[in-house]
């Protein structure tokens, strides 16, 4: 049964690689790990890389790669191309690069970092830590109790589930949207941020000029006249509608 499953998996990956080669016109390598902890490295072309049972290190290079972590605690480093990266069953670390990457967590408590590209980042089923990079990123907190940090760009942060989510803005003006959980928003960054809380009992720490929806139950505002005051000074508590 195991051999038949392995043959099916290998055939499936080869079929995906054939689709990628047909779409790109470039040769794609198929790199598959085994039950050990492997170092799996792609090529400058469009690759398919699949981790297996070990704690793998996966290095995608310059192509538009398709990467899937396996059952171990894997570390994935996307390359300079526009990569699609998916976490596996373990607590994985997924890191983007210069390309506009699509990265999604798996079953574990994953750490996903967008780095230098314009990235689409989505949490998985675990309690994930989601971080954008220096560009404008879109971040979705998914099924776990996630921690979302926009990074340096003008980012869009969303919650998609009933779980509680921590949102952190950055000094570039972000849009943050909660869902059904009891979410916490921290946007004291000296820029104009947009906060949409959604359902649940939500808490917002905002600057005086941030635009905070009336469905946010608890809002703490502070007048900011310089960035030096973002973490210092007295707080003012403002209820919705005031």
Residues of each region from the PLM?
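Bacterial N-terminal signal peptides
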Residues: 11-22
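Glycine-centered beta-turn/loop sites at beta-strand termini
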Residues: 33, 42, 51, 60, ...
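Charge-rich, low-hydrophobicity low-complexity segments
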Residues: 2-4, 21, 27
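Bacterial N-terminal signal peptides that target proteins for export
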Residues: 2-13
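N-terminal segments that cap or nucleate solenoid repeat domains
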Residues: 26-66, 229-237, 241
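Leucine-rich solenoid repeat scaffolds
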Residues: 187-230
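Beta-strand repeat architectures
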Residues: 63, 149-150, 174-183, 196-203, ...
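Consensus positions within tandem repeat domains that build extended binding/scaffold surfaces
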Residues: 37, 46, 55, 64, ...
